[in-house]
Amino acid sequence: NKKLINTVYNYKPDLLIYGHADLIKNSTLSYLKDNYKNLKIAQWFLDPLIKNGPDYFKNKSRILDKMEFTDANFITTSPDALNFLPKEKKCLFMPNPTDPSFEVLNNYENNHCSMDVFFALSHGVHRGILKKGKYDERADFVNRLVELTPNVKFDLYGIDNVQPIWADSFIKAISNSKMGVNLSRGEPIKYYSSDRITQLIGNGLLTFIHKN
């Protein structure tokens, strides 16, 4: 919190954007608002806000926690699908972004892919291994898809004790597939998708998502 206050003091920014800023106290944002009248504060929120989805109450609490100090909130779910957002606060939809410095592949130009369809899931962001005994309905869907399409070559991770992959290993894996499946946890909600969709589409894979 002291580092943030010192940074604002040194640079006098016009805009402060935060996301997953659990370590930043409300009192810090209040201080900045009081002492830098031209400072605008915005929140970027990319986690699921699905009632029957993963971590709903935790994510709901997190997005609301510092909203009293924000001038705008950018959310990867359509705000009109969320009935708990304060009406007086500016909340706007923002899709998960892609950037050519991260999404470096152009798989639509690759005529030598050894696999047809890529899919990966994990039990937590950058969690190296699967949790024992954890059930994920997406695995059922993908396994059924494999059964229905015996002539399709699937490259699957996070399913049937095949561990998740990250970073360079992830890029190398998707570089060998023509298509990708993007499945979000929980029931569909307007505009929301796992940010995996940007990694697949941004790297040039033909990408399949929920119909809803």
Region spans (language model):
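A short, histidine- and acid-enriched strand-loop-helix "catalytic/donor-clamping" loop
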Residues: 42-56
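Short, glycine/charge-rich beta-strand/loop segments that flank catalytic centers
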Residues: 22-23, 47
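Glycosyltransferases and closely related glycan-assembly transferases
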Residues: 5-16, 26-41, 87
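Nucleotide-sugar donor-binding catalytic core of glycosyltransferases
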Residues: 1-3, 11, 20, 26-27, ...
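Short secondary-structure transition/capping motifs
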Residues: 17-21, 52
